[in-house]
């Protein structure tokens, strides 16, 4: 018989740097999860992506055991890294902070394809381009 799920916790944690301090500790403490067990396992699984923010979905069962799924980093984080900028534009329609080739947007779309709600790579690329536009990053051919 399958275990009963008691809670699903969604967090965004920096890869390889999960620790019991907020936001991880309080979120998992309320669910009754072994916080250090999660931190060690998460850091081990994400050590190759150090520095990126990784969304994680933790499924907590009634016996307080857990499993978790790591997702791809948010599109905004990948776009900022690709454009080599620290911060997006406060006024994306007026101030463009960077230019990014369409091929780079397509690479990001390919890496995020499993997490995007898109039928094909073209639709995924358009989603990434829309995110870039809202951040003040201009997509050029």
Curated annotation (Swiss-Prot):
Upper lineage: Bacteria, Bacillati, Bacillota, Negativicutes, Selenomonadales
GO molecular function, one term: large ribosomal subunit rRNA binding
PANTHER family: 60S RIBOSOMAL PROTEIN L12, LARGE RIBOSOMAL SUBUNIT PROTEIN UL11M
A Pfam family matched in the record: Ribosomal_L11_N
CDD domains, per database record: Ribosomal_L11
Subunit structure: Part of the ribosomal stalk of the 50S ribosomal subunit. Interacts with L10 and the large rRNA to form the base of the stalk. L10 forms an elongated spine to which L12 dimers bind in a sequential fashion forming a multimeric L10(L12)X complex.
InterPro entries: Ribosomal_uL11, Ribosomal_uL11_bac-typ, Ribosomal_uL11_C, Ribosomal_uL11_C_sf, Ribosomal_uL11_CS, Ribosomal_uL11_N, Ribosomal_uL11_N_sf
Entry comment on modification after translation: One or more lysine residues are methylated.
Protein name: Large ribosomal subunit protein uL11
The entry's keywords: Methylation, Ribonucleoprotein, Ribosomal protein, RNA-binding, rRNA-binding
Keyword DNA-binding: no
Function: Forms part of the ribosomal stalk which helps the ribosome interact with GTP-bound translation factors.
Cellular component annotations (GO), alphabetically ordered: cytosolic large ribosomal subunit
Family under the similarity heading: Belongs to the universal ribosomal protein uL11 family.
GO process annotations (BP): translation
